[in-house]
Structures are given as structure tokens and as C-alpha cells.
């Protein structure tokens, strides 16, 4: 039942976060991982797994929060184009740190544990009740913020208004809460946050972001549900969700 719950949460959180990023930057290549959040989650998970100083979920959240704080400060000082460039470079740097941590794994068991998280699956191995409650709170806050700012983002995307840098930074923080609710538990699932929002914009020509929230959430949940059922009922073992999306 918890696995199905996180299929639903991931199917909503990642596409909605992707739609928000595309509207915030007015760019169809906008993605929840474009500012290095995915790389930061992987670095935090790797550090937590290899050191044992906290749970994998908490480590992932803390590192993603630090990354968001850095992006928050940068957002206050640069324009959109410069921020995207910074995000790509910053994400590459964080990813390199994660690689260094992983290649120095103390033993094979820890390396396997990290890999299974990084490959993304809904088995929720090693996830505690506290992790679940924490992620549900993040999801509720992030989704509420997405709905609250829907009209403002639509006007911003249409060029009717221009958000201040502070407003953009606060939106980034809200998107981080939404995305981390999924990534910290299930691992990074990249295709859902980029491909699904673009498919939604092909299907629906309206610029009302609320319609794309609905369409993207339905498509994302449906796609992840199919891949989860394939992984559960076909003897593939633990199969990465990001790969299952293409396999299915």
C-alpha cells in the first residue's frame, strides 16, 4: 500500500514541479533537476549511506535543502538565463562530489544500497515511519504552494507580469519541498519531470497552469503505475523506474 502511495506522490510531485519550472523560466526545457537538485539529493544519499550518520532520506533532504538555499541566494542576484547556466554548472559540480563519495564506499553492501536508491524504485527499503511522515508533510506544503501560486505563474508565463527575484526564490523553495517529498524516498526519476509536462503542453494548448497540473499528474501517475506493476508482476527483480518508463 505504501508503494502505491508513493507511486501516486511521485506521479504528482515530479510533473507538477516540472510544469512550475517551465512556467517560472518560460522555457520548455525547465526541469526540477536543472538547478542541481537531483545531483544534491544523490550526494546527500551517498554521504548518508557511506557514513551512516543519518538515514538516507534525511541525508538526501538536507543536501537538497542546502543546494536550494544556494540557488535561492543566486536567484536574488542574477537573471533567468544566468541562473540556468549556474544550475547546470553547479549540478555538474555536485554530481562530481557524489561520484567521489560513491567510489570510496567502505564496502559492497553500502554501494548496493545506494545504487538501488539512485536507480529509483518503490520498494521503500530502509524507510522509517518518520521518513514517511516527513515526506508527506513536504508534499502537502509543496502541492498547496503550487495551487496557491497557479494564477500568478500563469500571468508570469503569459508575460502579463514579471515576478521579482525574491518571489522566484520562494517559488524555488516550494518546488524543492514538492520534489524532495518523492526523491528523498524513491530516488531520482528524471523523465517524469521533463517529458510529461511537455507532453501535456502538446495535448493541451491552454496556458492555464492548473490544467497542466491536472493533465501532467494524471499522465505521470499512470505511467509510473504501469512501470510499477510491470516491475512487481514480471520477474525483473528490482528494476529502475527510469528504465521501466522506456521498457513499458
For the regions a language model picked out, list residue spans one by one:
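Alpha-helical transmembrane segments in inner-membrane proteins
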Residues: 1-248
Amino acid at each position: 500500500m505504501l508503494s502505491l502511495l508513493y507511486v501516486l506522490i511521485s506521479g504528482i510531485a515530479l510533473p507538477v514541479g516540472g510544469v512550475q519550472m517551465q512556467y517560472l523560466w518560460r522555457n520548455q526545457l525547465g526541469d526540477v533537476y536543472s538547478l542541481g537538485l537531483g545531483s544534491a539529493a544523490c550526494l546527500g544519499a551517498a554521504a548518508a549511506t557511506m557514513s551512516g550518520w543519518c538515514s538516507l532520506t534525511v541525508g538526501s533532504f538536507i543536501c537538497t535543502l542546502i543546494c536550494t538555499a544556494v540557488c535561492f541566494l543566486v536567484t536574488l542576484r542574477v537573471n533567468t538565463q544566468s541562473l540556468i547556466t549556474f544550475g547546470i554548472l553547479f549540478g555538474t559540480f555536485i554530481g562530481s562530489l557524489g561520484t567521489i563519495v560513491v567510489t570510496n564506499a567502505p564496502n559492497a553492501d553500502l554501494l548496493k544500497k545506494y545504487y538501488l536508491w539512485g536507480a529509483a524504485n518503490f520498494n521503500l527499503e530502509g524507510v522509517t515511519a518518520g521518513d514517511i511522515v516527513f515526506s508527506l508533510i513536504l508534499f502537502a506544503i509543496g502541492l498547496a504552494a503550487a495551487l496557491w501560486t497557479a494564477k500568478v505563474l500563469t500571468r508570469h508565463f503569459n508575460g502579463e507580469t514579471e515576478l521579482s527575484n525574491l518571489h522566484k526564490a520562494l517559488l524555488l523553495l516550494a518546488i524543492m519541498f514538492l520534489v524532495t517529498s518523492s526523491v528523498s524516498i524513491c530516488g531520482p526519476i528524471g523523465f517524469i519531470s521533463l517529458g510529461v509536462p511537455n507532453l501535456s503542453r502538446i495535448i493541451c494548448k491552454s496556458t492555464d497552469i492548473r490544467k497542466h497540473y491536472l493533465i501532467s499528474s494524471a499522465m505521470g501517475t499512470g505511467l509510473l503505475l504501469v512501470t510499477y506493476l510491470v516491475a512487481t508482476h514480471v520477474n525483473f527483480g528490482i528494476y529502475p523506474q527510469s528504465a521501466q518508463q522506456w521498457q513499458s
